[in-house]
Amino acid sequence: MPLTFANVGEENMIKKVGGKPETRKFLENLGFVAGGTVTVVSTIGGNVIVKVKESRVAVSKEMAAKIMV
């Protein structure tokens, strides 16, 4: 399921990062890699705030929809 459907506070394993090659590279540089874990902290406006690799990152809902957990 896309990261946008994950419950707040629930740790999820990243299964796949989709999108264009440059989008995948950008997300991988932020720590979104297959096999890694991600936790949705909150959703504010059009952004999803997540915890990945001990950092909090805000990504747009469009980008979050490309991350499968």
Please give the residue ranges for each predicted region.
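Compact, glycine-rich, soluble single-domain proteins
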Residues: 1-69
